[in-house]
Amino acid sequence: TGAVSVVKVDEIQKQGENNPVKALQGRVPGMNITADGNPSGSATVRIRGIGTLNNNDPLYIIDGVPTKAGMHELNGNDIESIQVLKDAASASIYGSRAANGVIVITTKQGKKGQIKINFDASVSASMYQSKMDVLNTEQYGRAMWQAYVNDGENPNGNALGYNYNWGYDANGNPVLHSMSLSKYLDSKNTMPVADTDWFDEITRTGVIQQYNLSVSNGSEKGSSFFSLGYYKNLGVIKDTDFDRFSARMNSDYKLIDDILTIGQHFTLNRTSEVQAP
């Protein structure tokens, strides 16, 4: 196929993204990725725009096997290479399913040499870059009084329980002397009045933990690769989180004087997620 983009996996792994496809944003021309903001890192991928009213997702090929599983379930540390096929010629290889483009992912294999053991761990934090300034109870009451006066209406007719002592000065301009608010918001006196910053109440500093262990080995007769991974993301919205446990075992061996080669690619993923309401 002609239009092929090859992405350096080392650069993606440095980002620490849960979803390896999400890390392709800005690296592949003509590829648009929209994340939903949830801790799982799930994203919508468009390679050739929107061409149908039905499914516009690209075809994912992992080690030669087509899949529709979310890429946030794949451990990015297990990836050896990523190729994005964008032109129509890919349909001659993968059929009509490649109409929206193809993302080919190859996972790691053992390499010839001594046994290699890798372990990495990382902890990072996520938070809002900027916070919206909100009004407290008094500031909101003053703003509402001004709005009622500007509309020529009686501010004491509000439905929130604000009581205003106001009048006009010598020049006829409205002046607010004082204001009061009922102790409770409801008639049954169960909801007390308070200065509540709801942004602070529903958000927190998110914590992302990632641990990966891999063992690889290779010789002239074969190779093997084994990995374990754990990823946990406590979202910035309270009570949202994502957990993923992954295990992978890739191996291939040459038999009968290299006439026959057998191999297997085995992966196991367990995920749990609580999304924002």
Segments from the language model and where they lie:
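Short, small/polar-rich motifs associated with maturation and membrane association
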Residues: 1-249, 253-269
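Outer-membrane beta-barrel translocator/channel fold
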Residues: 271-277
